[in-house]
Swiss-Prot record:
Modifications made to the protein after synthesis: The N-terminus is blocked.
UniProt catalytic activity: Eliminative cleavage of polysaccharides containing (1->4)-linked D-glucuronate or L-iduronate residues and (1->4)-alpha-linked 2-sulfoamino-2-deoxy-6-sulfo-D-glucose residues to give oligosaccharides with terminal 4-deoxy-alpha-D-gluc-4-enuronosyl groups at their non-reducing ends
Annotated protein name in UniProt: Heparin lyase I
EC number: 4.2.2.7
One Gene Ontology term of the molecular function aspect: heparin binding
Amino acid sequence: MKKQILYLIVLQQLFLCSAYAQQKKSGNIPYRVNVQADSAKQKAIIDNKWVAVGINKPYALQYDDKLRFNGKPSYRFELKAEDNSLEGYAAGETKGRTELSYSYATTNDFKKFPPSVYQNAQKLKTVYHYGKGICEQGSSRSYTFSVYIPSSFPDNATTIFAQWHGAPSRTLVATPEGEIKTLSIEEFLALYDRMIFKKNIAHDKVEKKDKDGKITYVAGKPNGWKVEQGGYPTLAFGFSKGYFYIKANSDRQWLTDKADRNNANPENSEVMKPYSSEYKTSTIAYKMPFAQFPKDCWITFDVAIDWTKYGKEANTILKPGKLDVMMTYTKNKKPQKAHIVNQQEILIGRNDDDGYYFKFGIYRVGNSTVPVTYNLSGYSETAR
């Protein structure tokens, strides 16, 4: 009997130690995934729901066991001044990224297909379309996440800490004659074999030999073909021009015009006053002076979205969207709750076949190199 009791005690201790080890996480998160072009290996999947994207430096993304949320380690993100590694929206600009993506695919998602399906998805940059995390076009969903902004955070930083993106397909193209059409996968692959794509612009593929006779290919002149590539986030929470802001973007054009950079400025735009071009609308749904934004505490955002419904090739809006945002936190040991966006009708989304996916972290834009550090945690999403 004593042996049985001792055995049960040992088992209990092992279970408790295992549970504690699962809760106690700290240090660098080392793996990165290009969700558009690669599947995620098991070791790269974080807490069974994320993969990391962006710059891979030891400090860029870490578990933070000292700053916990609901008893679990949070995610600490950091970009230093020299960490902008991407081309910016405008010529000559740069931007930086260290984020967690809720959408990704694994090899299991391709098991029922022949190998060519994955190989083609890599070329199409649609690997993540086969996996998890993308909601349906025109659907309704609820999202929750929490952010911790330290009082040391610079008031001149320009960063997006949470964003929703569309999931476009490169099979939607414009021909050199200006015809907009959707290619079959085989038709797109025929273009892929003889062209190099830089963002949405196709260039002739030019053969080049090095001194050893090895053949490589470089981009020649633009040849008039354009492919769908996406655009601004459909919804973004961030800081810019001395403000915390929430911005919704809409693009009703079937093939996005990348030259149209219609984009509301948090500093100058009025709240809920849309800023529009022919096809695009950008709206500051909420803004708050940065000095008033709560620091050194966890802030939870509960977000309800009815995504706008679009008319595909007709370039029309069938039904506007709706946005609702609650902001809760604790100040001086007292719970605070603010209904900062109250069931507002709004244009929000993209005219694509597929819907949207969530990312949070640091997305430093506007050519900013101001160092930034903050923590995020507590994400969930549900269909409504």
